[in-house]
Regions:
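Domain-level signature for soluble enzymes in the chorismate/prephenate branch of the shikimate pathway
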Residues: 1-97
Length: 97
């Protein structure tokens, strides 16, 4: 592999590493907010899950994915995983309250 190829490959990897770090930071911020939502729901005896909100989120995310040339099914799978974690956390908060 030539030095130019190695350098370009390294640049790609650096970009991916930066994006991965940003994703982790964004997820951390998202979960900080959903923790607050979980406590709010527990204090006001609201259910941990909101199917209407989840459906709206999925529909919106699919639109964003399509507009960004990202497979909407892939984006939906990621969001569903995140939503499941949030609901699990909200249920734990509810049980602790």
């Amino acid at each position: 592999m030539s030095d130019d190829v190695k350098a370009q490959h390294s640049e790609f990897r650096d970009s991916i590493d930066n994006i991965d770090a940003a994703l982790v930071h964004l997820l951390a911020e998202r979960f900080k907010i959903t923790q607050k939502v979980g406590h709010f729901k527990a204090e006001h005896t609201l259910p941990p899950a909101d199917k209407n909100r989840e459906a709206a989120q999925v529909a919106h995310l699919r639109e964003l994915a399509e507009a960004s040339d990202l497979d909407p099914d892939f984006a939906e799978r990621i969001l569903n995983f995140i939503i499941a974690e949030v609901i699990k956390n909200h249920e734990q908060i509810k049980d602790e309250t």
